[in-house]
Regions:
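Active-site beta-strand-loop-beta-strand hairpin of nuclease catalytic cores
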Residues: 105-115
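A short acidic/basic microdomain associated with nuclease active sites
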Residues: 82-106
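Metal-dependent nuclease catalytic core centered on acidic motifs
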Residues: 83, 119-155
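Acidic active-site catalytic centers that drive phospho-/nucleotidyl reactions
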Residues: 74, 102, 115
């Protein structure tokens, strides 16, 4: 699959409806600025490893915000690391757990695991898979920017 979005003629220029999920809006809206967004997302998607495209596409198209935004964030982070010159392995196996982080990124002698997390709130509660913090094991380095918390650990 080389596209996330449907190959359709778009004529609806109306803004997003209050009840409309993000993907449905992006897929239907017919304005030039949103066409550029679709083209950019599809370009990133074409560079994503083919073996993992079906899963990512399904989650990106999901009406559940946690799935949609999680897939969007994974695609963005994957593209970022690739453009920074890193090799990116998707869902690498770990020796100490059956869980798999989103990526193992490496360049030269530098390697790190990356887990992409999107926290959404609805009426004061965290939504999404598990509803809590995910941990891959001891992480001695923690960076809290106030917006994003990053835990760094050598791979």
């Amino acid at each position: 699959m080389s596209t996330i979005f449907d190959d359709i003629e778009r004529r609806d220029r109306s803004p997003a409806l209050h009840t409309e999920d993000s993907f449905s809006f992006l897929n239907r809206v017919a304005t030039p600025e949103w066409q550029r967004v679709r083209e950019l997302v599809d370009a990133w998607y074409r560079d994503y490893p083919e073996a993992s495209q079906t899963d990512l596409r399904g989650r990106f198209r999901d009406s559940d915000a946690a799935q949609h935004y999680g897939a969007w964030w994974e695609l963005y982070v994957y593209t970022l690391f690739r453009r920074l010159g890193y090799d990116v392995a998707i869902h690498p196996a770990l020796l100490t757990t059956t869980r798999q982080p989103d990526f193992l990124v490496s360049r030269g002698e530098t390697a790190m695991y990356v887990e992409c997390v999107v926290a959404l709130t609805r009426m004061g509660t965290i939504s999404g898979d598990g509803g809590g913090e995910r941990s891959w094991g001891p992480c001695p380095h923690v960076v809290d920017t106030g917006f994003v918390v990053m835990r760094l650990r050598a791979a």
